UniProtKB/Swiss-Prot annotation:
GO biological process, one term: cell division
Function recorded in the entry: Involved in protein export. Acts as a chaperone by maintaining the newly synthesized protein in an open conformation. Functions as a peptidyl-prolyl cis-trans isomerase.
Entry's free-text remark on domains: Consists of 3 domains; the N-terminus binds the ribosome, the middle domain has PPIase activity, while the C-terminus has intrinsic chaperone activity on its own.
Keyword annotations from UniProtKB, A to Z: Cell cycle, Cell division, Chaperone, Cytoplasm, Isomerase, Rotamase
Pfam families listed in its UniProt record: FKBP_C, Trigger_C, Trigger_N
GO annotation, cellular component aspect: cytoplasm
Gene Ontology MF annotations: peptidyl-prolyl cis-trans isomerase activity; protein folding chaperone; ribosome binding
UniProt protein name: Trigger factor
Signal peptide: none
Annotated organism of origin: Syntrophotalea carbinolica (strain DSM 2380 / NBRC 103641 / GraBd1)
Principal subcellular localization: cytoplasm
């Protein structure tokens, strides 16, 4: 077998093969011998059918089998011999005739992993949000908790106000005609929730129980029903009843229901929770800004095969999470194909970032040591609450372990780059303004 390798681009190679007559004849001979054992030809016993008879009836089938075997065997051997890091299946772009007694030639193209040499990654100019939890943040979260445990009771008030739950009958009309789906009785509408057509809830505020009222609104231009989008409408509304949410008392009993001893302990817990959530959000945003800067400084092509693999990985993760919640992808209004289209650019960015971080790890000799892996596994056991044996068994799987090590390696590179970066701490508003300027 003779192989010639040519670079088509930085991410694609062409391999030209010439396979000897002997190798071709051996494959044809093996295929016909195998076929002779199973072929049913009138007048011949299995295993006794002459090759000439088989050739007349099965030549096309045998040629296809030999073609597939020769390409697979020679192509993947060439990848090893030539040390080619392929990231996609081969695409045969040309081939000569495949006949017994003749050498066989073919050409195949394959995408390869780009050879990335990272640059301009020391001293990145980055902005990072400076955040501190304010007392008002804690109070707001505390109010949310109280509201989530509120009881809905019939109000003694006769006039509806913002925040009330109005129990209404309504029927909508466009151009004087009732429309499908525009009528309901005993509908509970929280005033101020903005869950109805814009302007509707504001006009219910101030109505008295038992009052009838014509409410004039206009459907939004982007309304889901095209027949109603942008059109003015009149709703005939009757306010039947007013309900309100009664918050529980903020006392020791409430704190104990949340698993804490006092209101002060609850506030401390809430503060810690907010700090943790904000810290995660800020770190995620900071890492995105870092990878954006790295991608901008390091331009290179990314193989379509690597992007496809990343999209498949993202899709599988999403499907698994949704399945665990008893949901399907279609429940989000998308399917696998539309997901691939929507998130292709995101996947390409993730692949680029990963390749750059891997290159930096190699260039800076940043490695994940065995004792670091052990410490990480202990941390996973502690934070997840899962049995140690279960965690160790899961990460004894080669694929799971590689994923963990890859994640740890990226974290090590990010920590290295953070230590070398020029970081300006700014408030949230300044950071958002900077984002708008960059866009």
């Amino acid at each position: 077998m003779n192989v010639k390798v040519e670079d088509i681009s930085s991410i694609k190679k062409k391999l030209s093969f010439e396979i000897s007559v002997e190798a071709v004849d051996t494959e044809f001979s093996n295929e016909y011998k195998k076929l002779s054992k199973t072929a049913k030809i009138p007048g011949f016993r299995k295993g006794k059918v002459p090759r000439s008879v088989l050739e007349r009836q099965y030549a096309g089938h045998v040629e296809g089998q030999v073609f597939e075997r020769l390409v697979n065997e020679t192509f993947f051997k060439a990848l090893v011999d030539e040390k080619i890091n392929a990231v996609s299946a081969p695409e045969v772009v040309d081939n000569g005739p495949l006949k017994p007694g003749q050498a066989f030639t073919y050409e195949a193209e394959v995408e390869v992993r780009p050879d990335v040499e990272a640059k301009d990654y020391i001293g990145l100019d980055l902005k990072k949000e400076n955040f501190a939890v304010e007392d008002q943040d804690v109070e707001d979260r505390l109010q949310d908790m109280l509201k989530s445990r509120a009881k809905v009771e019939v109000s003694e008030r006769e006039v509806a106000q913002a925040g009330d739950i109005a129990v209404i009958d309504f029927e909508g009309f466009v151009d004087g005609e009732a429309f499908a789906g525009g009528k309901a009785e005993g509908h509970e509408l929280e005033l101020g929730s903005n869950s109805f057509i814009p302007g509707f809830e504001d006009q219910v505020v101030g109505m008295e129980c038992g009052q009838d009222k014509d409410i004039e609104v206009a459907f939004p231009e982007d309304y889901g029903n095209e027949e109603l989008a942008g059109k003015p409408a009149v709703f005939k509304v009757r306010l039947n009843q007013i309900k309100e949410r009664v918050l529980p008392a903020l006392d020791e009993e409430f704190a104990k229901e949340a698993g804490l001893e006092s209101v002060e302990d609850l506030k401390i817990k809430i503060r810690e929770s907010i700090e943790g959530q904000e810290r995660d959000r800020i770190e995620k945003d900071f890492r995105e800004r870092m990878t954006d800067a790295l991608i901008e400084a390091n331009e290179f092509e990314v193989p379509e095969g690597m992007i496809d693999s990343q999209i498949d990985y993202m899709l599988k993760n999403l499907q698994n999470r949704m399945q665990a919640q008893g949901m399907r992808l279609e429940d989000m209004g998308i399917n696998a194909e539309s997901f691939r289209q929507i998130y292709r650019e995101v996947a390409a960015k993730q692949v680029k970032a990963s390749l750059i971080l891997e290159a930096i790890a190699l260039q800076e000799n940043l490695k994940v040591e065995e004792d670091e892996i052990k410490d990480k596994l202990e941390e996973i056991v502690e934070t997840s609450g899962a049995p140690k044996e279960a965690v160790m068994n899961y990460y004894s799987n080669d694929e799971s372990r590689r994923g963990l090590v890859s994640q740890m390696a990226e974290e090590k590179v990010v920590a290295f780059l953070t230590g070398k970066a020029k970081i300006e701490m700014v408030d949230k508003e300044a950071l958002e303004n900077a984002k708008m300027t960059e866009e």
